Amino acid sequence: MRLLQVTALFFLLSNSLCRGENSKALTETSTTKASATTPDMVSITNKSTGGTPPKGTTNSATPKTPLMPALDSPTTPKHETTTRGVIKNEVSTIKTTVANPTISNAVSTLSSPQNKTENQSSIRTTEISGTNQLPDDQKPKTTETPSASLTTAKTISQIQDTEDGKITATTSTTPSYSSVILPVVIALIVITVLVFTLVGLYRICWKRDPGTPESGNDQPQSDKESVKLLTVKTISHESGEHSAQGKAKN
């Protein structure tokens, strides 16, 4: 991470130094006046007493025809007019964010400082003239939006494909579960019905058997009769003993 930070700082410093050199060379060589009509326009009047004008100011009128950026041709013809004495400059500051990457790319690709200054001046003129419009190839928004839409469409189609695959998988698996569960449930129901019918038939047959209920009813009656006989015998035996004892006493 530290190495990345150090390299990033190094690149930023090198870019800033290159831009500073290019701006100095531009102020020494280019002395053109530019005016732009934009909705957010701020007019600034700068007065200098000779030498070079301040940064970002020019002193000659630009042609009325729109200037196209000349990035491909490093050597472009320039029309320069130098004046001496008191100079009155009118500058309009324009907020542009499209030409900044083109400037950095142009500065980084070129090798000699002369080519850098020439390309910088040509790009600067296109920046200052607000009526100029970049072609469709150099607009980052027009080039980025189709790719973004294509990527979003691809991702949406992939998501839809995956969702369709999941849905088909679930539909294919649900019949398998039902085909396994339904026979098991039917078999359990049949087994329970058979068990209940067998138990009912056994009970009906056991009730209809003639021997079992009579024997069951006779057993308690015979027991009662045997108990009665035993009680009668004991009572008669005791009465006989009592009579024998009474006779003996007499």
Swiss-Prot record:
Q: Give the encoding gene's name.
A: Emcn
Q: What does this protein do?
A: Endothelial sialomucin, also called endomucin or mucin-like sialoglycoprotein, which interferes with the assembly of focal adhesion complexes and inhibits interaction between cells and the extracellular matrix.
UniProt record, GO biological process: angiogenesis; cell-cell adhesion; hematopoietic stem cell homeostasis; regulation of cell adhesion
Which residues of this chain are annotated as glycosylation sites?
46, 115, 119
Q: At what positions is Phosphoserine found? A: 226
Topology of the protein relative to the lipid bilayer: Single-pass membrane protein
What keywords is this UniProt entry annotated with?
A: Glycoprotein, Membrane, Phosphoprotein, Signal, Transmembrane, Transmembrane helix
- Compartment list: Membrane
Traced from the root, the source organism's taxonomic lineage reads: Eukaryota, Metazoa, Chordata, Craniata, Vertebrata
- The protein in question is named Endomucin
Q: How is it modified after translation?
A: Highly O-glycosylated. Sialic acid-rich glycoprotein.
Species, as recorded: Rattus norvegicus
Q: Does the keyword DNA damage apply?
A: no
Biased composition, Low complexity: where in the chain? 24-38, 45-60
